[in-house]
Each structure stands twice: as structure tokens, then as C-alpha cells.
Amino acid sequence: MIIGAKFITSLVKFDENLSSNFSEVAFLGRSNVGKSSLINSLCKQKNLAKSSATPGKTQLINFFEVTCKRNEEKFNINFIDLPGFGYAKVSKNLKEIWNQNLDEFLKLRTSIKLFIHLIDSRHTHLEIDVNLNDYLKRFLRPDQKILKVFTKCDKLNQSEKAKLKNEFKDSILVSNLNKFGLDSLEDIIINQTLGLDK
């Protein structure tokens, strides 16, 4: 279980000198899909990860050191809150710079063990999400895993949840509002970063 967390630093772009002694979990998704809210819910801190009211305004890679406990043993991992993607209100040139920075970061950051791809449960087949999943698969290493996490599931009825889970069998459905699915997600994060989820 997660028992504590603190903010470490923010980066504008990939810095190969910022090494990590811990396994890392990267949170990716469209703007306003709920990345920061999910990190706050998992870490049980309301304002740990800050979300911007203006999509695309904050384009930083944010690092958080997370303390976990398993069988009385404590260990640390890093959560990485990546910039959201898919905004309409920024220039093409700025998008290209962001994409280049993220591409370099995701491919070269070998300490990342789990990519959590957040998808709005009401919009499950958007082209931008399909493209992200295909992109991650192209450079995924044997010690890495992609996990689809469908957010805002409190807005679905039971039938819609069952249909979604049936279509995406290895996914997790969560709601930051009523804390649905967070315990299951926490278990996967801990097992994957410890190398137990084979």
C-alpha cells in the first residue's frame, strides 16, 4: 500500500542527468483525463499533483517520490506526471517541441516499469488514445508494462462498466470521486515496480 508521497522536481524537457534509484510509474493521457487527480487519490493527498484549469498551459514533467509498504517492508518508487496531450489551443510548433521532448523521455527513461495510460471511460476509442497505445508498444521492453486505466467511471452505470471491462479485460476502471478501483490499481503498481507481476 502507498503510505506517503512528496513532490521532487519538475522538468521542462528530458534530462539524462536526473537519474533514479527507484522504479518509476509514468502517467499518460489526454488533457483533463484526470492524471493529477488520480495521483492525488492514490497518494491520499489532495493537492500533491497540481492540475491546470487551462488544458495545455502547464507542460512540465513532474516527479513524486512515493513510499510504499508491502509485508511490513517499506520501499520507494517514483510517480511521473507527464503533460497531457491533445489540445487544440496551442501552436503546431509548440506541439512538435512537446512531442519531441516526451518521445525522448519515454524511450530513454529506463527506470520506468509501468506506463499507466488514462482514458476517459465515456470516450474509449479516440484516435489519439489508439495512437498512443501503438506508439508505446513499439519500444516497450520486457521489464515494462502498459496498463489502460479508464477514469470517471462514476459516470457509467453497471451495464456500461461491465461492457467496458469485457472489452478491455486487462484494464482497470477507476473513479477519483468515489475511490472505485484504486486498491486494485495500487496492487498492480506495487507488483509491477517490484518485478512481481509477470
From Swiss-Prot:
Annotated binding of Mg(2+), by residue: S36, T58
GO molecular function: GTP binding; metal ion binding
Binding site for GTP: 29-36, 56-60, 81-84, 151-154, 174-176
GO biological process: division septum assembly
EngB-type G domain: residues covered: 21-195
Signal peptide as annotated in the record: none
Key words of the record: Cell cycle, Cell division, GTP-binding, Magnesium, Metal-binding, Nucleotide-binding, Septation
InterPro entries linked: G_ENGB_dom (IPR030393), GTP-bd (IPR006073), GTP-bd_ribosome_bio_YsxC (IPR019987), P-loop_NTPase (IPR027417), Small_GTP-bd (IPR005225)
One Pfam family here: MMR_HSR1
GO cellular component term of the entry, any: cytosol
PROSITE patterns cross-referenced by the UniProt entry: G_ENGB
Cofactor: Mg(2+)
UniProt function note: Necessary for normal cell division and for the maintenance of normal septation.
Assigned protein family: Belongs to the TRAFAC class TrmE-Era-EngA-EngB-Septin-like GTPase superfamily. EngB GTPase family.
NCBIfam families: GTPase_YsxC (TIGR03598), small_GTP (TIGR00231)
Name this protein carries in UniProt: Probable GTP-binding protein EngB
Taxonomy of the source species: Bacteria, Pseudomonadati, Campylobacterota, Epsilonproteobacteria, Campylobacterales
